[in-house]
């Protein structure tokens, strides 16, 4: 039996931090970028706005966890091919309950009605420009996800331009020959 710095015993050599997923869901509504938030129904940060998310079960992948938590907390039912894994947040103090690593996902969806469920007291679309003070490090997740989605959209536009010009311009050896 190994013992950690905080006195907990483990049946393996190293302590295991908790793993969570969070998902930043964007939608465009009336010319404004919106972010899907939930109001926390439990401590820590009870009553504070946060991203949909939660703890990873032992029998699911990180993507499955993000999709499950999103559906449980907002009613929004996305498919695996609609989400992107954006970044892993590992700050030592990101969760007051203990060492927690969060895998952040993101999606851009059509705007639709949502409702709070499970441990989320409410779910609501909020303008990205008017984000309230968020629980945990969720503001950083929103900013990182927005940068990521902008990059994806620029790459998509570039690929469409290359395809429209034909495959010749994709191979520099063929240019001018």
What are these regions (language model features)?
Residues 56-152:
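Unchanged
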Residues 2-50, 63, 78:
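N-terminal strand-loop-strand
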Residues 32-76, 161-177:
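Conserved Nudix-box catalytic region and its N-terminal flanking loop in Nudix hydrolases
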Residues 5, 142, 169:
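Alpha-helical and His/Cys-centered functional microenvironments
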Residues 6, 30, 97, 115-116, ...:
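Feature targets compositionally biased, intrinsically disordered low-complexity regions
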Residues 26, 141-142, 164, 175:
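A generic signature of intrinsically disordered, low-complexity regions enriched in glycine/proline
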Residues 153-159:
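Charged phosphate-binding loop/patch that engages nucleotide di/tri-phosphates or the phosphate backbone
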């Amino acid at each position: 039996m190994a013992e950690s710095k905080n006195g907990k015993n483990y049946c393996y050599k190293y302590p295991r931090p908790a793993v969570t997923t969070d998902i930043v869901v964007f939608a465009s509504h009336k010319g404004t970028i919106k972010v899907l938030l939930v109001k926390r129904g439990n401590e820590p940060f009870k009553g504070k706005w946060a991203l949909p998310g939660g703890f990873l079960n032992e029998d699911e992948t990180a993507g499955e966890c993000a999709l499950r938590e999103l559906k449980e907390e907002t009613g929004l039912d996305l498919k695996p091919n609609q989400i992107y894994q954006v970044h892993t947040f590992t700050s030592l103090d990101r969760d007051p309950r203990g060492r927690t690593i969060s895998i952040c996902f993101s999606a851009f969806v059509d705007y639709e009605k949502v409702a709070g469920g499970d441990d989320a007291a409410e779910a609501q679309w909020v303008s990205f420009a008017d984000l309230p003070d968020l629980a945990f490090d969720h503001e950083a997740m929103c900013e990182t996800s927005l940068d990521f989605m902008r990059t994806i959209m620029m790459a998509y536009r570039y690929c469409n331009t290359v395809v429209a010009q034909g495959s010749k311009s994709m191979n520099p050896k063929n240019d001018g020959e």
